[in-house]
């Protein structure tokens, strides 16, 4: 068992949030730099965490952190700094601000041609210059109307982005590696819409069962198949005389903050007799958990009821996101944070759980697909500013983050965490050499 003989079980958890993954990536880059100060330039995040859990964009980060960097001749895992660069390089391609829509252009041309044929069949093509000029003015308006109809059709029936660039990037970063081949244990949730059930992709499960051993590419595309934004993902695993079909949507609909899910999965792995398969029976002194959020806009009152009669369109169409998903994911995230804070504090081991999150994003920053360079830079700045803010926990009465008295800054907490991770790794290396 992967956790046997260890003084601490170390867990890293990364929320979903699209381009807002820059925020946790920035914090991870700082953590890795501190680890490198202690253990050398070759230190990588994957060397220090027994389990890395991630949802959606956090799942992509998880997969990269636990995969060899194809540009590294020594096959070391991706560095956190390189993952931060990945967001700046690829976000504009995955989430283009003005996505090309060749199907829309073809459809408009076809419809315009049909209108032209109809006019000809009616024998009303103007022969005089004045009539032809009127027709020339009519077609731009017609094209505008067609454009509106086609855009509305695509909004209702198609994802906002075609996902082709995401597939290319995932293939480039993780190659043909399978889930059982990650460099540390990963836990990546998704949701099967056919079974209406959360699917947890796990390295340890994959090592035991071929039907759990999905290609890492499919895992990434499953956990990041955000409703409305990207296509769903369907794939199949075949084994000897067995097969399994997956019909997947973004893991954020079930566990946008995967920390609690990760602890639950670890509890199952650590249980030999079934007695410890719930958190109540776990000794939290044996866990060291870092949970990284991608930000929320709670303080900016993003949603407000002006008209009480919200139909399907109001729930699905907001200025900077999907109100239904925003409410669902924020509610789940809040409950996970509240439960885990109480769990570790109640056992007087609050230093074993560090959650870094902001609830002050504005309307521009909260968009998961806002790949504008200025916004990406703002998100990186937010990550750096978070390091200087005090360690915080959610206030149960207000639902807002409140500084924990005497806990210091997130920077100081990360530096302290780096030392504990380094000491734990050195202890294990010394133990394995004797």
Where are these regions (language model features)?
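Conserved catalytic cores and adjacent C-terminal regulatory segments
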Residues: 1-434
